[in-house]
Amino acid sequence: MELEAKLHEIKKPIMVLGTSSGAGKSLTVTAICRILKNLGEEPIPFKGQNMSNNAWVDWEGGEMAYSQALQAFACGINPAAEMNPILLKPQGNSISEVIHLGKSIGTTTAKNYYKDWFTPGWEVIKKSLKSIYEGNPNCRLIIEGAGSPVEMNLIHRDLTNLRVAKYLNANCILVTDIERGGVFAQIIGTLELMKPEEKKLIKGIIINRFRGDLSLFEDGKKWIENKTQIPVVGIIPWLNDSFPPEDSLDLIEKKSLSKNPEIKVGIIKLPSISNFSDFDPLENEETIFIEWIRKSQNLSKYDFIILPGSKQTIKDQIFLENSGLSKDIRDYSKNKGNIVGICGGLQMLGTTLEDPYFKEGSKNYSEQKIKGIGLLPLKTTFFKKKLTRQIKSKSIWPCQSEINGFEIHNGQTVLDEIQSSLKINPIFEDSDLGWYKENNKGGTIAGTYIHGIFENDSWREHYINLIRKSKNLPTLNKKSISYKEKRQFIIDNLANEFHKHLNLKSFLS
């Protein structure tokens, strides 16, 4: 039986729409997921289409947006690609990789996407919704929209917002960010651009990120309710930076949480950075201060440098070379510097990058084979097929411990025999997952394909202690709460803050 015929049998979905990008949809959905879980419901997150290079890999090897994975954690369930059936991964120049149900199926321009991919995209969304309900008949979907639901030039091709809301007859909440100003115009303008049948789906309004005394907005609340005839179901206070950023823009603007830093970490801000959630565990370390490196400079003030993942490794390596950052990194390594490269960062630390199929940002034949930074004797070739999988392994360095994480990459990395005099060692028992090299003057150069490596508490703590030892700082022997437990604690705090100020009763009937 088709899902449409069974909609009267399912629990009414809750959909969170926003007046703009960055209004707070992702965190609102995350909070609602945990609130409903705590109330004994079976929430499941859903976002029909997401555009992000911050990805997660589920246990079937399917790619999905990290924000939906985080929402699944809030629900107490394993992430699955059907929670985000369409993922678009920007590659620059208005080109994106298209991922359906976790699998890469090609690339497209923005113009061609709306022309050629709309119908198959809608079918994938409906297929995912049907699968979720068949496997979880008692669940309540908590759905996230994207951007604004009333982009009038795109609304007839919008797969993520009102089309999904109408299909499921969802109870919708409209979220707006008062921190940015202009909430009255945003709310009224958004509602006025909706058709009458769409506006009827909006059952509540949330004012997000309110600073100061909430009672000072009482007159504003009454005005909105009188003007729209829709209740303001929540005025959420401004929450500090301890909650996860929603997208890459938020991340770059985010300040380090450390109040008493003993270790200073520099992360290279690549133009095509991906999987920035890799650094969340470091953000939550009390003794670590993180700074983003955007331009050429003397790097000696940093205790270690991270080269993050990249969606366009060739393009980003050319940026590093042209900007002078490649030389800065090489100079840093000669001065007892410690460096960690993750995925694309690992590849760039090698000697050679070859892109025969133009998969990683090479624009012409002269860019198909370029030099890497040259700190590890490794060469990488990018192939058409992408490897996506969950990882369970054991580390050899800097400690022996169980390791979990995931891989997402096209490149295959092997030892560069011409540079084999640069001795390297495997980091893991699965030797193709990462390598490290100790400098003669001190410091280590390490690279791994494992995203989420810093989520492994023992590995992270041993690496940090390696850095501390190089600074003659005492070893941290604390058996601290694990990062994954801390992530749950952060989600609980988020949900508790929302629950204090959000009335969901009318949405649970």
UniProtKB/Swiss-Prot annotation:
UniProt xrefs under InterPro entries: Class_I_gatase-like (IPR029062), CobQ/CobB/MinD/ParA_Nub-bd_dom (IPR002586), CobQ_GATase1 (IPR033949), CobQ_N (IPR047045), CobQ_synth (IPR004459), GATase_3 (IPR011698), P-loop_NTPase (IPR027417)
Task: Write out the GO MF terms.
Answer: ABC-type vitamin B12 transporter activity; catalytic activity
Pfam family for this entry, one:
CbiA
The UniProt entry, under PROSITE patterns, shows: GATASE_COBBQ
In the record, biological process GO terms are: cobalamin biosynthetic process
- What domain of life does the native source organism fall in? Bacteria
Q: Which PANTHER family match?
A: COBYRIC ACID SYNTHASE, DETHIOBIOTIN SYNTHETASE
Q: What HAMAP family does this protein map onto?
A: CobQ
Q: Which family does it belong to?
A: Belongs to the CobB/CobQ family. CobQ subfamily.
- Name by which UniProt lists this protein: Cobyric acid synthase
Q: Which organism is it from?
A: Prochlorococcus marinus (strain MIT 9301)
Q: What is the lineage of its organism?
A: Bacteria, Bacillati, Cyanobacteriota, Cyanophyceae, Synechococcales
| Protein encoded by which gene | cobQ
